[in-house]
C-alpha cells in the first residue's frame, strides 16, 4: 500500500489507525514511512480517536468484568491491564506529546501530566505486567493472557517469588505466605496504578 492508502484505511478503521500510530520504522524506505506519518498527523482527529478507544475500553471492561481484582484476570484486556496502559500511550501519541521512540511516561513528566514519582511507578507497573504476559506465554507455549489458577504458581516461581513464613516479633511462625499470593498481590497493585492513571 502507498502512504495515502495506509492513511485512508486508518481513517476508516480505528484498529488500523492504532497500528499506524504505533508503527516504527524498521526497514525499507524511510521517506515513505515519514510521508505516511506526516499524512496521518494532518488528518488525525485526536478527540474522535480517543472517543473510539474509550468505547473499545468500555466494551472490553464489560466483557472481562468491571473489577480489576478478578481471581483469574486477563493480563492484557482486564481493567488496569496492558490495553488500559496502551490507551494512555495512544492518547499521548495522538496528542503529539510523545513519539514512538520516546518513553511516554517521561514525556508525560515533560508535559506536566505526571510528576517524576508517578512516572516511575507507571513505568514499573507497565514493565511488571508486560513481564507477566511474556512469562505466561513462555510457560503456556502459546499466546495465553488469562492468569488461570493453574498458571499462578508456576508463573510466580518463574518470576522469582517464593513461599516464606511470616513470623511474630517473638519468632513464632504465624502463617506461610505462598509465592502465588505474593505474586498476585503485586499484580493487583500494578493494575490498580494503571486504573488510577486513567482517571
Name what the model sees in each region.
Residues 1-199:
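A nucleotide- and high-energy phosphate-metabolite-utilizing enzyme signature
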